[in-house]
A protein has these predicted regions:
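A short beta-loop-alpha structural element at the N-terminal edge
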Residues: 19-31
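C-terminal "cap" of GNAT-fold acetyltransferases
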Residues: 161-188
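Conserved GNAT acetyl-CoA-binding A-motif
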Residues: 118, 125-137
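Acetyl-CoA-dependent GNAT
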Residues: 49-96, 101-105, 118, 179-181
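Conserved acetyl-CoA pyrophosphate-binding loop and the N-cap/start of the following alpha-helix
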Residues: 108, 112-120
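Active-site acidic-Proline motif in GNAT/NAT acetyltransferases
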Residues: 102-107, 111, 139-140
């Protein structure tokens, strides 16, 4: 996907911390894997896929190369400290939807990095033909739900016993959506 938005570039977070934003490339597999493996177990508990596995990150990189996924990495000192991805199935009946995934290192939380990364995705989404962003969480991810609500998402559904965590425990899935047109202008 050729994007108009300029990358790489440096942004300042709310506390003045500078991070470099750039697009993930297939050669970033080991950096992303190192980031994923540094996350606390609770952060990994309900991810749709296990990003601590090499094969999973390699498939992610293949989706980037094929144009199905765009991932914005946040780096400091060449280490990944967060990312936001939008996954887009261009041929299904949901081709107007993009799935948002955001992950931020604990040391960079409460600084606005998740919000910055989310805004990047909303700025990119129209260039991909995406009209609506979908986010999936579990009901106990209260901070994440509050963050996406503040960003303009609304809850569409709660699907009970819909996901199984890494330890085999079932939980619900909260489905939240936001129209891209409503937020794309504020992401510029």
């Amino acid at each position: 996907v050729e994007l108009k938005r300029p990358y790489p570039r440096t942004v300042k977070l709310g506390d003045g911390t500078a991070v470099r934003l750039r697009l993930m490339e297939p050669g970033d597999v080991h950096r992303v894997l190192a980031f994923a493996r540094s996350l606390p177990a609770d952060d990994l508990q309900f991810l749709r896929v296990d990003i601590t596995r090499m094969l999973v990150v390699m498939l992610w990189a293949q989706n980037i190369k094929a144009g199905h996924t765009v991932t914005v990495l946040a780096e400091q000192d060449r280490e990944v400290v967060g990312y936001a991805s939008v996954h887009h199935d261009q041929v299904s009946w949901q081709r107007h939807l993009g799935e948002l995934r955001v992950q931020v290192a604990p040391a960079f939380r409460s600084k606005g990095l998740g919000t910055v990364l989310g805004r990047e995705i909303f700025a990119i989404a129209p260039e991909m033909g995406i009209e609506k962003i979908v986010a999936h969480m579990t009901p106990d991810q209260e901070q994440a739900i509050a963050l996406v609500k503040r960003s303009g998402f609304q809850q569409e559904a709660v699907l009970h016993d819909f996901v199984i965590d890494r330890s085999g425990r079932k939980n619900g899935r909260v489905v939240m959506t936001c129209d891209v047109a409503a937020l794309a202008g504020s992401a510029s």
